[in-house]
Amino acid sequence: MALTLLRGMRTPVSSGSNPGLFFAVLRPRLSRFTARAESAQATEPKAAPPPRSIQLATKEAAEQKTQGFEAVIGIETHVQLSTVTKAFCSCPYSYGAQPNSTVCPTCMGHPGTLPVLNEKVVECAVKLGLALNCEISMTSKFDRKQYFYPDLPKGYQISQFDIPIAKKGHVDLDLPVEFGGGHRKFGITRVHMEEDAGKLLHSESSSYSQVDLNRAGVPLLEIVSEPDMRTGIEAAEYGAELQRIVRYLGVSNGNMQEGSLRCDVNVSIRPVGQSEFGTKVEIKNMNSFSAINRAIDYEISRQILLHKEGQADQIVQETRLWDESSQKTFTMRKKEGLADYRYFPEPDLPEVVLTSDYINEISKSMPELPEAKRRRYENMGLSMQDVLFLANDDNIGHFYDSTLEHGADAKLAANWIMGDIAAYLKDEKVSIDEIKLTPLELSELIASIKNGTISGKIGKEILAELIAKGGTVKGVIEEKDLVQIADPAAIEAMVDKVIADNPKQLEQYRAGKTKLQGFFAGQVMKASKGKANPVLLNKILGEKLNAN
């Protein structure tokens, strides 16, 4: 089918219009799901979401009824780097900027322009390669990956083909406890540098699609895994671990909703015990890790059903789109093979030659990574549930470590962060680095409870104020007169008064209704405004209630 393209036409910038390049809508190539996924208007930048756990299906739902088959899953992950400028030109990139406002002749593919490699891209690639336990190539090169699409202005993408910058690595992770837990090790085939394409903007109300080339030339690192995963949960956790790693390294914000981290999943099935792979199907359009889990589980079920119905020949090598509304995958296009891309060396860029000193300097600057942090926390005696919560977010891990540096008990600090502080972060939808509480004051709060200066109940009230308003533990205690009453005589006097004021309850208690001790304790705490030492209170109260 012939398609007419209006090349190079650009609309004036005005209210109600979009300065994108116009192309006839490519109906045969694009599905209705793609069209719905993109807005025809520029999207405003969004703040990074607060830390949260991956919402996956239950363990029982994740266990596929494979009926003698096993899934083979590999993932290609594209990580958009947080560099100041693009990969091969000096244009900046800002998510949500006005379409076609951060472009130049180089990233728009004008004739006669030449690429110049951004050194920061190489540094990020080496960092990620080391973090993934890869072999770093001392010499690598760029290649042209050629295909036609309106968002690819040069008609080819600068990538790496046969000599990537890193290869033969692995990633370690721990599955959540609710899914059975356990350690997993997944192989990494390669990490290579490349540039991003532009972005097609579709509108169902128009017969044209627009092209925004702001993203064209933005540096990417593609991470290709070995086909080592067997379930949707494993694949989702693999993607989440890569996100944690790039955030720990600072090479990318890893935000899936901005396209900074994109996962394309390859799924096939085969009879258990068979060494040969089945027909591989690629799945795209998954914008969360829970969507990755659900898309894979659906695709496994679809392929098993076709095998059971004698229609295995209908499983073809293709690209399918995940549709969130129907919870199904749909055919997008036939999958290209390597020969279709006609790779050949990029003649306008020299080889990338590294030295041992350069790699060693980068290695020395590497931060502690998620896997090392998990093992350190585990050796401190924390449960795996605590370990995963604290280590899975770099900001939370840093806050926790800083609290320990100020002398806080490891388990008590973990309990406070995972309890009241985590609840506040969830309710207010903020990150831990946005609250006014400091690690020093959390350690002071824990110490004040431990040494009896304040009670745990008062501690919770102080914590809430410190989180919202800031300040110091000592200052709040003095300002509100919250020092715990630990004088036995003072507590005994309050106990005597409460017992005297409640003769009926005293009679019921001594008749066998011993649960009423909680009533008396509550009345004393009320009289003391929550400041009575609870251990001392219960001791004195028990003696008084049981006295003859």
Curated annotation (Swiss-Prot):
> Under which main EC class is this enzyme filed?
ligase
PROSITE patterns for this protein: GATB
Keyword Coiled coil attributed: no
In its keyword annotation, does this UniProt entry include Chloroplast?
yes
Q: Which GO terms describe its biological process?
A: glutaminyl-tRNAGln biosynthesis via transamidation; mitochondrial translation
Q: Which keywords has UniProt assigned to this entry?
A: ATP-binding, Chloroplast, Ligase, Mitochondrion, Nucleotide-binding, Plastid, Protein biosynthesis
Superkingdom per UniProt? Eukaryota
**What Gene Ontology terms describe what this protein does at the molecular function level?**
ATP binding; glutaminyl-tRNA synthase (glutamine-hydrolyzing) activity
Localization, UniProt: Mitochondrion; Plastid, Chloroplast
Annotated EC: 6.3.5.-
SMART domains in the cross-refs? GatB_Yqey (SM00845)
Q: Which Pfam families match?
A: GatB_N (PF02934), GatB_Yqey (PF02637)
Q: Name one GO cellular component term.
A: glutamyl-tRNA(Gln) amidotransferase complex
The chemistry this enzyme catalyses reads: L-glutamyl-tRNA(Gln) + L-glutamine + ATP + H2O = L-glutaminyl-tRNA(Gln) + L-glutamate + ADP + phosphate + H(+)
Which family is this sequence assigned to?
A: Belongs to the GatB/GatE family. GatB subfamily.
Assembly and partners are described as: Subunit of the heterotrimeric GatCAB amidotransferase (AdT) complex, composed of A, B and C subunits.
Give the free-text miscellaneous remark of the entry. Answer: This protein may be expected to contain an N-terminal transit peptide but none has been predicted.
Q: What does this protein do?
A: Allows the formation of correctly charged Gln-tRNA(Gln) through the transamidation of misacylated Glu-tRNA(Gln) in chloroplasts and mitochondria. The reaction takes place in the presence of glutamine and ATP through an activated gamma-phospho-Glu-tRNA(Gln).
NCBIfam families recorded: gatB, PRK05477.1-2, PRK05477.1-4
Q: What is this protein called?
A: Glutamyl-tRNA(Gln) amidotransferase subunit B, chloroplastic/mitochondrial
What's the source species for this entry? Answer: Sorghum bicolor (Sorghum)
Encoding gene per record: GATB
